[in-house]
C-alpha cells in the first residue's frame, strides 16, 4: 500500500490505492484507501475501516467455492456496507459468476468485472471501460454505467 500511496502522490490520475484484505469470513478489497487494512478482522470491521478512510468496498469472487468467499446470506446481511460486487472473475466457475451477478442485481449494487491478474500474461483479458471521475463517489456512479469487456482469452476456469 505504501508504494501505491507514493504513486498516487506523484500521478493521482494513474492510481487508485487499494488492498485486498482477508477477513474471518472472506476477502474484501478497499479502493481509494489512505492506509493499510487490518487483516483477519470481522468483515464489518474491515468494511467500516475502508469507509472511514473515504474508500469503497469491493467483494472479489464473492461466491467462488474454491476460495475464501462470503455465503450469499452473509452478503445480504452486509449489503449496507458493500459498494461493489465482482460479477465476473476469470478464475471462478461460470455458475459462481452468474450467481454473483444475480445477487448484485437483487441488492442494487454496482457490479464489476475483474481480471484477478497475478502475472503480466494475465493482463488485458477482462476489464471495464468507464467515464472519467473526480472522486470515489463519481467512480462508483460511473462504474455503474461502465462497459464490461471479457475477451475470449479470459475464459472461466482454473489458472494454468
What are these regions, as identified by a protein language model?
Residues 5-38, 44-48, 52, 65-160:
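Charged catalytic cores and adjacent phosphate/nucleic-acid-binding surfaces used
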Residues 52-58:
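Short beta-strand/loop segments at the ligand-binding rim of alpha/beta enzyme cores
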Residues 62:
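Cofactor-binding loop segments of dinucleotide-utilizing enzymes, especially the Rossmann-like FAD-
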Residues 58-59, 86:
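Conserved beta-strand positions in the central sheet of alpha/beta enzyme cores
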